[in-house]
Amino acid sequence: MFILVAISIDANDNRRHVHVFYKGKRHQHSLAKIWIEANGQQCVEIAESSLSAKDNEMLVAAINRHWEFINEQVTKAFNGEKTISIDIEK
């Protein structure tokens, strides 16, 4: 349904975040930007979104459940390392 992406050029933003895209679409634009931390601590919040409230709630809950893995992948992306992806249940 969705794919979360850490974009390495965003490494200097003031808060770590992921961008949300529809999975499998060719011409994509970010549907949402979700912060995953504040001051180095887990804090998942919608920064901006064109998704429904239901989708936003589902994404925030999923990111909270898998925060350690997602944060690790963001670190790897920002360091230019290979990242891996997993399917996450709603």
Language model: regions and residue ranges:
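Well-ordered alpha/beta subsegment
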Residues: 48-89
